[in-house]
Structure formats: structure tokens, C-alpha cells
């Protein structure tokens, strides 16, 4: 059997098909790519529908990642808590802190997990084959057989629980709860979350995927488990491989876990948000000794394009670099010259189904908002009239293309994240990894007036633009802390004697669990075999 590669070249498929079939997989497509320095293999697990992509490029630094589409339905941070919790021990590896133990012995070049607004990923990289396989198995066991299913202590530790202080007053505790209290005290995080809230009221992006401290305590252990079972399923899984991976061994590991499940039909679709104009205001805390004058942040935000329009998305990034990439960039220079703002920045978030832009003016002078917005209009209108500097556009395109072709390390992880920019939404996982055709189109755009028209669409058309004001406050922090205290006091006031005893027992069990060290037998499950030299498997043709 043969297949045509993307360059029209034929190559045999028999060995690859046999290898896949042996482990319950079916090869869907194989394409060669000069840009990827190898080929992309796509397959699916026949029983569950789990998808797998392998970028077979001979890289010694091998990457494995299992990813799930995770769509928040509220701001409890359930998927952030799950990301932490599944890595607190599993059926084969019942160690309380596998990360800590793995870092002591593994040769991993990357070892982490990440929660995004619409996905959660578990990537590892290693140059050592045996280490790579061990890491892949630990992660597969973590996501498909976690101890959270039997041990609620993990949820209480990583998510939230109530403790009583020395005076008997209730307090919220929990790793994610504390992490997000810190994150949400940062003004940049507040601007980011408010922007999502305003732009996306009708889909998952409007929720705080990391968790809002005001809403994290709304999550129950039962809800936590329901969301795990609904989303952490092979039918919703995407497995990404990159480099000189031992495919037969990886598929053996994967099949061991996938075969335990039956297919689920839920597709977890993301409805597209219809763009609209909106205005919003929020407060952020400053120190009691600080003056509130000239401390307002002004953000202009807009949905840019659907995920599939990679040319427009990349063009927007290039445009922002030309407009605000340095103090001499025309838009930033004009705004700073007014003396009415301290800094200007533009950003684009493209790791989602609907990439969006933000233009933020920091520490603007009180009463200067309309003047600054008019300066944006006047500057952009003048640039549209005269045309953007062609040399600046060319330089930015060249820099962007270099970054796309040389993504840095671990390159396999970056390819995985980029592939998910299309793959997660039903698109071609190869599309975001190929840059030659895209940059050819961008150069054609730069030769004409396409960038000028894009600039006008994004910055002059306010019919779909959101305006977010983030204003300083001496009382915001105190108000939030008082609100939390009042909530806890109300909860405590409603406790029955049975509730008090249940909390005491729960916290005693949690403390005992936390203070019980892993046994030698448990730690031995993570002992890794070290090989002095990286190994490269024989390629499967």
C-alpha cells in the first residue's frame, strides 16, 4: 500500500500500518514536509477515537504530550485544579508528589503541565529513550488512572478547603486558591481576565479558566469528579509525538490505557462569539500611600479572526510590532509624545478558537481618555493615508519568519502547542507548523496596501471594539477581603454540630495524609533506568 505525501512523493505504508494496527490504531494520513524535516503521521485509536499525531523528524530530543479539550462552564477553575491534582499520584505511581521525585532522577528536558482557556496539556521531553518512555507512562497513568478518583484529600489540598485559625475563625486554603489569589491581585492579570469576560460572554472564553478566588469555593468534590470523567477521556484526547520516538513502544503504552475505555460521542464544540462593541470598568488595588492620580489603564480589545485565518492572525502580530514594537514605532511614539500615558503595548492571543487583540495604555493622565483615543484615530488615519513604512514591515516579517522557523527549545513542545491551534478545533494539525506559504502571502500584502487596510479595520472600526478601563482604588483589596470574610462567617454560622465534626475529621485526615511520607515501595515505582547515550530507533518507512 502506498500514500502520496504532500510533495507528491510516494512511500510505502505497510510497516507503519502494521505497527498501528497491532495496537488498535488506524493510520489516517501521512505527509512528508521539507519544512518539518520529515513527515507527519496522523492516526486514531479505533475503539475510543483518541487522535494521535507524530512529527517524525529524527529529533533526538523526543516529545510526548497528551492534551484534552477542556471548556470551562464557570470560573471555579476546575480544569486548573484537575491539572494539579492528577499529578498527585496514580494507580501505578502512588507517590504524593511525582513531579518532585521525577525531577530528582529523570533526564527530562521538559516536564510540566499547562491549563489554557480551552485545553489542558501534559507534555514531557527527553533525549534518553528509556527516560522518555517512563515519563510517557507516568503521564498516561496520571491522566487516565489518577488517585483523585479514590482520594478526596488531593482535591482539598490542590483546590480548596476550610480551616480554622487559632481563634476559631474560618479561612480558605488550597494550592490553586492561593495561587489565583496572588494572580488576581496583579493588574495585568485583571486586565486580561476582564478583557476575556467582555469579549466572550457567550462561550467558554468568558470564564476564568485558572479560577476566580470568589468562585473556586463553589466547586464540590462531586462536580470535580464529574468534569474529570467528562473531559479526561480518550475520546477527547489528542496525543502528540515529536522526534525519533520508538513508535511501537509508545503505542504499546497508549493502548494499555485507551483499551480500558469505550467511545464517548460528546464533541465539546466551541460556539463562535459574535463580535460587538462594549465598555466596562473595573478597579485594581494600590497601596494606601500611593496617589490614585494618573494610574488608570485603558484597554482597546477586539476579536481579530477565526483560528483558521493564520495569515490575518500573523499579519496582526506583525502590524503590532510595526506600530508599537519600540519607542520609535509610530503609534507608540505619538501616544507617548502626548505626555498623557507612561507606556503603550499591543498583544495578540492566538492560542484559542478566536484570536483577539489588546491595545493597552498604562497610567494615563486623569481626564485624558478621549484625547488619547483621538490620538489613536488621528495617527492611524495618517498612517493609512501615507502608508506604513515598507522597510519596517519587511524587517518585522523577516523577524517573525525567523522565529517561526527557529522556534527555540524544546521545539517539540512548541510544535505541539502550535499544532493544537488548528487540531483542537477540527483543523489540519500541520497547517500552523508550515510557514513558507504564509510568509509569501504576507510579503505580497506588504507590497500593496493590505497592512494599511488591516490597521484601519482593527483600530478605526469601533463597531466591534471593547473598551476596558481599569482604575486604581485604595479600597478594592479591603472590599474583596471583607467579602470573603463575610462569606466564611455566614457559612460558619450555618454549621450544625454534625457539620463542625465533619470538618474536623476532614482536616485531620488531610493533615495526616500530608504528613505521611511515601513508602520506599511507592517511591520505587518511579525509579528510572538511565542510559548513558541517547538512542535513536530505526525509522518506520
PLM segments and residue spans:
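Non-catalytic terminal extensions that flank enzyme cores
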Residues: 9-63
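An aromatic/glycine/proline-enriched structural segment found at the starts
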Residues: 11-20, 238-296, 386, 488-501
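M16/MPP (pitrilysin/insulinase) zinc-metallopeptidase core fold and M16-derived inactive scaffolds
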Residues: 38, 56-141, 145, 153, ...
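Scaffold signal of the M16-like zinc-metallopeptidase fold and its non-catalytic homologs
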Residues: 89-91, 135-149, 166-235, 248, ...
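Acidic/histidine-enriched alpha-helical segments
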Residues: 146-178, 246, 265-279, 379-416, ...
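Structured mid-domain segments that build the active-site/substrate or prosthetic-cofactor binding neighborhood
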Residues: 298-391
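Extended, domain-scale alpha-helical bundle/helix-rich regions
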Residues: 447-481
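Single conserved hydrophobic/aromatic residue that forms the stacking wall/gate
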Residues: 529-533, 537-540
Amino acid at each position: 500500500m502506498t500514500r502520496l505525501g504532500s510533495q507528491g512523493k510516494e512511500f510505502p505504508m505497510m510497516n507503519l500500518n502494521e505497527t498501528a494496527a497491532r495496537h488498535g490504531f488506524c493510520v489516517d494520513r501521512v505527509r512528508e514536509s521539507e519544512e518539518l524535516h520529515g513527515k507527519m503521521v496522523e492516526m486514531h485509536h479505533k475503539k475510543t477515537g483518541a487522535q494521535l499525531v507524530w512529527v517524525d523528524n529524527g529529533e533526538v530530543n523526543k516529545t510526548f504530550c497528551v492534551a484534552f479539550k477542556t471548556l470551562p462552564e464557570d470560573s471555579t477553575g476546575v480544569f486548573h485544579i484537575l491539572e494539579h491534582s492528577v499529578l498527585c499520584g496514580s494507580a501505578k505511581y502512588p507517590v504524593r508528589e511525582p513531579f518532585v521525585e521525577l525531577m530528582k532522577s529523570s533526564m527530562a528536558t521538559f516536564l510540566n503541565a499547562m491549563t489554557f482557556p480551552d485545553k489542558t496539556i501534559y507534555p514531557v521531553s527527553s533525549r534518553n529513550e528509556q527516560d522518555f518512555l517512563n515519563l510517557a507512562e507516568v503521564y498516561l497513568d496520571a491522566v487516565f488512572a489518577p488517585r483523585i478518583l479514590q482520594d478526596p484529600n488531593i482535591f482539598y489540598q490542590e483546590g480548596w478547603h476550610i480551616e480554622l485559625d487559632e481563634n476559631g475563625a474560618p479561612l480558605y486554603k488550597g494550592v490553586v486558591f492561593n495561587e489565583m489569589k496572588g494572580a488576581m491581585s496583579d493588574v495585568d492579570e485583571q486586565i486580561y481576565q476582564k478583557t476575556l469576560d467582555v469579549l466572550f460572554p457567550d462561550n467558554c472564553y468568558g470564564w476564568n479558566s485558572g479560577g476566580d478566588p470568589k468562585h473556586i469555593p463553589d466547586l464540590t468534590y462531586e462536580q470535580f469528579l464529574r468534569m474529570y470523567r467528562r473531559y479526561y477521556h480518550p475520546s477527547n484526547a489528542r496525543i502528540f509525538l515529536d522526534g525519533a520516538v520508538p513508535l511501537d513502544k509508545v503505542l504499546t503504552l497508549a493502548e494499555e490505557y485507551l483499551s480500558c475505555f469505550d467511545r464517548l460521542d460528546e464533541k465539546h464544540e466551541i460556539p463562535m462569539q459574535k463580535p460587538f462593541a462594549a465598555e466596562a470598568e473595573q478597579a485594581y488595588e494600590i497601596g494606601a500611600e500611593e496617589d490614585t492620580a494618573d494610574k488608570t489603564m485603558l484597554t482597546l480589545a477586539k476579536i481579530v479572526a477565526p483560528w483558521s485565518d493564520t495569515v490575518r492572525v500573523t499579519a496582526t502580530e506583525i502590524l503590532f510590532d510595526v506600530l508599537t514594537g519600540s519607542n520609535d514605532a509610530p503609534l507608540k511614539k505619538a501616544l507617548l509624545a502626548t505626555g498623557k500615558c507612561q507606556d503603550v503595548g499591543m498583544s495578540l492571543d492566538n492560542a484559542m478558537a478566536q484570536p483577539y487583540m489588546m491595545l493597552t495604555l498604562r497610567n494615563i493622565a486623569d481626564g485624558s481618555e478621549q484625547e488619547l483615543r483621538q490620538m489613536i484615530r488621528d495617527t492611524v488615519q495618517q498612517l493609512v493615508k501615507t502608508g506604513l513604512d515598507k522597510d519596517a514591515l519587511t524587517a518585522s516579517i523577516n523577524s517573525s519568519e525567523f522565529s517561526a522557523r527557529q522556534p527555540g527549545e524544546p521545539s517539540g513542545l512548541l510544535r505541539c502547542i502550535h499544532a493544537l491551534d488548528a487540531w483542537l478545533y477540527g483543523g489540519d494539525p500541520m497547517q500552523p507548523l508550515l510557514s513558507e506559504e504564509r510568509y509569501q502571502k504576507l510579503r505580497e500584502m506588504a507590497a500593496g496596501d493590505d497592512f494599511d487596510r488591516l490597521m484601519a479595520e482593527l483600530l478605526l472600526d469601533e463597531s466591534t471594539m471593547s473598551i476596558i478601563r481599569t482604575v486604581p482604588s485604595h479600597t478594592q483589596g479591603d472590599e474583596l477581603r471583607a467579602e470573603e470574610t463575610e462569606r466564611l462567617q455566614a457559612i460558619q454560622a450555618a454549621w450544625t454540630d454534625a457539620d463542625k465534626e465533619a470538618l474536623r475529621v476532614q482536616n485531620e485526615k488531610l493533615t495526616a495524609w500530608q504528613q505521611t511520607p511515601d513508602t520506599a515501595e511507592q517511591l520505587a515505582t518511579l525509579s528510572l533506568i538511565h542510559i548513558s547515550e541517547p538512542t535513536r530507533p530505526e525509522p518506520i518507512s
